[in-house]
């Protein structure tokens, strides 16, 4: 019997979590909460508007820990981090809500979104329509669908549920086969290429560059994971990739927003402030 990969372990636990949550709060109750939530802020539109200007469209991630690195940030106050990112020039936020493997929480998404005006994606392992409705009830503006975690029928079902509750969808791929499935199954404009292999957790920026020629121009490519310095940013920009999802590089910095500005908008200079998070 083969040893389960990290992704397989996460998905097995996620199925248990969905069962536990749906036993506590019914889908009908969640749908009522979703209808009462603040109007979506337009996640895809915000990225598209920035990319049209050939300016970095940064999805800045709020992430306390990961399976490969353990705790990444000890001083973890989502509202403060969100404000710092907004000031530093982020276009959108990504908030980890997975509890068991990333030490995330639903409340972190709510706190971050309430602290700023940026659109927010719920970063989690979505496998069930329940989680999609739950995301909207929490106030999310977008959800992540990971092709490696879903078959085509479920992927299409989750995207349809997302559309029904007013959520944008970011579909994430890791290789050519997944890209082909995503393009065939979903019409979302947002295609994320994760440079981290979710089975081994190794990172290679060439993943984005290799897949780029196969992605139609009308889709917006978001490069995810492994962007650590200006050279990485410039490598993507000369290839016409202007949208980035970055977490760890910011989370390890004393001031996440200042690090965002240093990495993506160096011409603005780095803000000077007494606060470690401003």
From Swiss-Prot:
Keyword Amino-acid biosynthesis: yes
Biological pathway: Amino-acid biosynthesis; L-tryptophan biosynthesis; L-tryptophan from chorismate: step 4/5
Gene3D superfamilies (UniProt xref): Aldolase class I (3.20.20.70)
Enzyme Commission identifier(s): 4.1.1.48
InterPro entries to which the protein is assigned, alphabetical: Aldolase_TIM (IPR013785), Indole-3-glycerol_P_synth (IPR045186), Indole-3-glycerol_P_synth_dom (IPR013798), Indole-3-GlycerolPSynthase_CS (IPR001468), RibuloseP-bd_barrel (IPR011060)
GO biological process terms, semicolon-separated: L-tryptophan biosynthetic process
Gene Ontology molecular function: any one: indole-3-glycerol-phosphate synthase activity
Disulfide bonds: none
Any matching Pfam family: IGPS
CDD domains found in the cross-reference section: IGPS
Catalytic activity: 1-(2-carboxyphenylamino)-1-deoxy-D-ribulose 5-phosphate + H(+) = (1S,2R)-1-C-(indol-3-yl)glycerol 3-phosphate + CO2 + H2O
Keyword field: Amino-acid biosynthesis, Aromatic amino acid biosynthesis, Decarboxylase, Lyase, Tryptophan biosynthesis
Family stated for the protein in its record: Belongs to the TrpC family.
Cross-referenced PANTHER family: INDOLE-3-GLYCEROL-PHOSPHATE SYNTHASE, TRYPTOPHAN BIOSYNTHESIS PROTEIN
UniProt name for this protein: Indole-3-glycerol phosphate synthase
Gene that encodes the chain: trpC
């Amino acid at each position: 019997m083969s040893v389960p990969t990290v992704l397989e372990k996460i998905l097995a636990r996620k199925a248990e979590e969905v069962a536990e949550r749906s036993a506590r709060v019914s889908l009908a109750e969640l749908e009522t909460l979703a209808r009462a939530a603040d109007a979506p802020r337009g996640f895809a539109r915000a990225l598209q508007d920035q990319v049209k200007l050939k300016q970095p469209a940064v999805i800045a991630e709020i992430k306390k820990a990961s399976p490969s690195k353990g705790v990444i940030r000890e001083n973890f106050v989502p509202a403060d981090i969100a404000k710092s990112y907004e000031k530093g020039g982020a276009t959108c936020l990504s908030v980890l809500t997975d509890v068991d493997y990333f030490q995330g929480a639903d409340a972190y998404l709510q706190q971050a979104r309430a602290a700023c005006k940026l659109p927010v994606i719920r970063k989690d392992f979505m496998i069930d329509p329940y989680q999609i409705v739950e995301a909207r009830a929490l106030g999310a503006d977008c959800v992540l669908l990971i092709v490696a975690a879903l078959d085509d029928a479920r992927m299409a079902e989750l995207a349809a549920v997302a559309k029904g509750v007013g959520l944008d969808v970011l579909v994430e791929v890791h290789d050519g086969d997944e890209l082909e499935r995503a393009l065939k199954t979903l019409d979302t404009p947002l295609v994320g290429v994760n440079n981290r292999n979710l089975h081994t957790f190794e990172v290679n920026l060439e993943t984005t560059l290799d897949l780029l020629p196969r992605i139609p121009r009308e889709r917006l490519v978001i490069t995810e994971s492994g962007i650590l310095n200006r050279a990485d940013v410039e490598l993507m920009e000369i290839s016409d990739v202007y949208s980035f999802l970055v977490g760890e590089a910011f989370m390890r910095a004393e001031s996440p927003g200042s690090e965002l500005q240093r990495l993506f908008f160096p011409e603005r200079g780095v803000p000077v402030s007494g606060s470690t998070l401003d």
